[in-house]
Every structure is written in C-alpha cells, then in structure tokens.
Design a protein with these regions (language model features):
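Cell-envelope and extracellular/periplasmic
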Residues: 1-267
Length: 267
C-alpha cells in the first residue's frame, strides 16, 4: 500500500513567521497528522518550536549540554526542561488544514529566519546576522527535500519589519522577485496560494513610521501577482517587546492564514 503524500506548507520570512510567542503546555503537545521536516531532512511530529532559527527541544551541543535560546522573553517550560523557542502560526494553520482535507498529513517546512531583510530572500542572499547562512537558498534545499514525499499546497510568508526599519527602497519589486523565485525554483503552479501578513500596529517608531513600505507592497502584489494575498494583523498583540506577536495572537493568525487559504482555493 502506497503511503499518501503529505500536503506541504512552506513557512518563510523573519521572526514573526519563525515564532517568538511564549510556549504553553498545549504548544508542546502533538497535533494529529501535523508533521515538520527538520534541518537534517528527517520528519517528526510537529511540536513547538517549529522553526529552524532556534534550538529544538532536546537539542544538545557536542559536549552534551542542552542548547537553549538566549531570548530574554522566553520562559523555561518544565515539560521541556529548557528554554523553548517561541510559538509560531504554522501548527495552527496545519491543524485546520488537516481537518478540512479528511485528516490529511500536513508537512510543515520551517525556513523563516529572524531579523532577515528581503535581500536575504533573494537567490544567494546572506543572513546579515550570520554571513555563513543563505536563507533563500537553504529554504529551497529543504523544500525540495520535503517535496520527495509531498506536494506544496501553500507558501506562508511574514516579513518586513527589518525593511521598514531600514527604509528599504524598491521593497515591492524585491518581494515580487521572492514570490516568483519560489514558484520557479520549486515548480509551483500559479494557483498555489502565496499568503503574507501585513505589518502589525504595535511596533516602536523606527519601524511603525515606515510600515507602509511593506503594506503597500502587499496591496500591489495582491493586484498584480497570481494567487498572492495577505491577512490583517493590525488588531493583534505583542508579547511585551513591541515587535513579536504573543501566543494567543499567533494562534489567531494561523487561523486567519487558513481562512485566507480556503478563500483563495474556493474550498
């Protein structure tokens, strides 16, 4: 009997897609039929953190010590025995997608990297915080590995805080290139949804004064690129740092991305 292929969901962008919400006991419990691919290409049940840019639960260094995040907003969960990277929106999206598709197995592909500008998501683009990392190139490698056992049904994107802070010129065209490159390099048809999130309303002035750079780009691409749309985040809350969504907001956001997916696919 052939194993059904996974429905794959690519998670890309910067820290608010990677996830920085506080982990709760619920977030450390498995969800039926929701899996994730790890950087070593192995599949596992998706429990938080579903991300590539922070330690996984049970990650150890070569000397046998647990590797923990140094994020001051993260808390030590007794269930994990270590600091847990924040919660993201991917698991919530996947939970609803599985239920809506006769309990299909959903495979999350976490590629988002905190702090990355849109330039890091160009072909050959470097992570400005780690010059040995190439977020877009690494995302393509991981996604292609995942495609051996599944088919990408959606790309979920949240990114732009860094570019608002940097007052990036030509953000619209840079993001358009990202969208088109993902479709080309992963052989995604024009009907595969590419869903973004607009900028929140809680940032400090150095970001909030320039969020139109990102929000206007999303409107333009919605009107000009096939199967591109975005969800609203303006009413959601931060975790205390005026930068990252809190856990309840990320659960809400995951449902909004799912609702947008269903709207775009007519399901």
């Amino acid at each position: 009997m052939n194993t059904p292929r996974r429905k794959l969901v690519l998670l890309a962008g910067q820290s608010n897609m990677a996830g920085r919400g506080y982990a709760t006991p619920e977030d450390l419990q498995p969800i039926d039929n929701v899996e994730m691919i790890r950087p070593d290409y192995k599949w596992q049940i998706a429990i938080e953190p579903v991300t590539k840019d922070r330690p996984f639960i049970g990650t150890f260094s070569e000397d046998g010590k647990k590797i923990e995040s140094n994020d001051p907003y993260e808390t030590i969960m007794p269930e994990a025995g270590q600091k847990v990277c924040g919660v993201g929106l991917g698991r919530t999206f996947a939970k609803y997608l599985s239920l809506a598709t006769n309990n299909s197995v959903i495979g999350l592909i976490p590629t988002a990297v905190g702090g990355t500008p849109v330039s890091a998501w160009q072909i050959g683009g470097q992570d400005p915080w780690d010059k040995e990392k190439y977020p877009y190139d690494e995302a393509i490698i991981l996604a292609k590995e995942a495609q051996k056992s599944g088919d990408i049904v959606a790309v979920l994107w949240h990114q732009g805080e860094t570019d608002a802070n940097n007052k990036t010129q030509d953000y619209t065209e840079a993001l358009r290139t990202v969208v088109r490159n993902f479709r080309k390099d992963l052989n995604l048809s024009d009907d595969i949804p590419f869903i973004a999130g607009n900028m929140a309303s809680f940032y400090n002035p150095e970001i909030s004064n320039n969020i139109d750079i990102v929000d206007n780009a999303l409107v333009t691409l919605k009107n000009e690129e096939p199967s591109f749309d975005f969800v609203d985040t303006k009413d959601l809350n931060h975790r205390g740092d005026n930068l990252h969504f809190d856990t309840p907001s990320l659960h809400i956001l995951g449902k909004r991305y799912f609702d947008k997916y269903m709207e775009m696919t007519g399901k």
